[in-house]
A protein has these predicted regions:
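Metal-dependent phosphohydrolase cores
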Residues: 1-185
């Protein structure tokens, strides 16, 4: 492993080999329903990328979807939504840290940050569709109001093992035209 300074991250310290961490990084802080094995960030990113492709989005938008949570492999990790959306000083600091990690990842791999509106809008929409699908398939039933939820995908999500998530992510990397970052790693 390399070294990472979360309060002064540098794109040149982002290593391709580190990206596998997203295949082990659980979404929702591991708070999925009983019987659901860990659902990882990389699986989610693959599904976002595939949804963007199904909608006919350009390769750059698909690539941004594939990388949209890769900054989470660094501190502070995958934070639950209420933690990042709050007005508490910790929430504000965690969101700033998360944005800075994502900026470094995107800059290192030649992707824009922040995403321009024509990329941000479809990536956020795909992310929201996946959130609805993940809630239906992976979360325990609850009376908690999550606000306006979009229609989930018809397909059900079955969590993948880390190696399967990694292989699928690498396949998507090639499909979006970014295989060169593997060859340069």
């Amino acid at each position: 492993g390399g070294i990472w300074y979360p309060f002064s991250p540098r794109p040149e310290e982002v290593r391709f080999a580190d990206q596998f961490a997203a295949a082990r990084l659980p979404r929702y802080g591991c708070h999925t329903k009983r019987g659901v094995d860990r659902y990882v960030v990389m699986h989610h990113e693959v599904l976002v990328c595939r949804l963007l492709r199904a909608w006919g989005e350009p390769l750059i938008t698909q690539a941004c979807g594939l990388f949209h949570d890769q900054g989470e492999i660094y501190t502070p990790g995958d934070q639950i939504g209420p933690m990042l959306r709050g007005s508490h000083p910790f929430s504000i600091a965690a969101k700033a840290l998360a944005d800075e990690q994502q900026r470094c990842v995107n800059q290192r791999f030649g992707l824009p940050w922040p995403y321009p509106e024509h990329i941000a809008k479809p990536v956020k929409l795909a992310d929201a569709v996946l959130l609805s699908t993940e809630r239906r398939d992976l979360m325990a039933d609850s009376d908690v109001d999550w606000g306006h939820m979009l229609e989930p995908l018809p397909e059900r999500i079955e969590p993948w093992e880390p190696e399967r998530a990694w292989e699928a992510w690498l396949n998507e990397l090639e499909l979006v035209g970014m295989w060169h970052i593997v060859e340069c790693a």
